[in-house]
């Protein structure tokens, strides 16, 4: 991943500058170029978009539940079957793939970002500290919202004896990241 290599190169250049070495501006610019075109902003916009979509999905789930219970006496019905199909088709298959890509990219980039940020700690401004805090809270809060939403979907379908992916994986349970994994 070119962004990780760029962050590592930039970290090394910061160390060199702190040690008093002279660097060519063009070398620093070359290190920044992959970041300018790369993943960093896309990751943050991905987490923000996911957070907004999850909040919207929570709102729809609230509205869906307020109208009437999905099932009575844990008995499935056509409405519950349609809901389970929707959850399985949209969330457990397509949306979950996108979430996994976002999570993997974040896990690749953030260690290099952390290394770079630690190397800049002595010259860190309050604005940068606030940005880092806000960024980390966005990611952490969105992860927590995802786990909560998946649990709610499971609980809602559980009132009918169903779960997302139930027909494919009868013992699927949500994992710590909010994805359903077969057991």
Residue ranges and their predicted role:
Residues 1-54:
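Acidic/His-rich structured neighborhood in mature extracellular/periplasmic domains
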Residues 38-183:
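A cross-kingdom marker for long, charged
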């Amino acid at each position: 991943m070119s962004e990780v290599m760029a962050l590592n190169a930039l970290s090394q250049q910061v160390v060199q500058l702190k040690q008093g070495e002279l660097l060519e501006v063009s070398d620093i610019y070359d290190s920044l170029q992959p970041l300018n075109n790369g993943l960093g902003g896309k990751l943050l916009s991905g987490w923000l978009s996911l957070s907004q979509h999850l909040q919207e999905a929570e709102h729809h789930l609230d509205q869906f539940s307020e109208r009437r219970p999905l099932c009575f006496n844990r008995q499935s019905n056509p409405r519950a079957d349609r809901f389970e199909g929707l959850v399985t088709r949209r969330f457990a298959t397509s949306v979950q793939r996108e979430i996994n890509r976002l999570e993997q990219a974040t896990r690749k980039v953030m260690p290099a970002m952390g290394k770079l940020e630690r190397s800049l700690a002595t010259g860190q401004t309050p604005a940068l500290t606030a940005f880092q805090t806000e960024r980390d809270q966005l990611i952490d809060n969105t992860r927590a919202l995802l786990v909560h939403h998946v649990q709610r979907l499971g609980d809602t379908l559980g009132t009918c004896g169903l779960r997302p992916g139930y027909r494919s994986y009868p013992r699927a349970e949500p994992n710590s990241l909010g994805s359903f994994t077969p057991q």
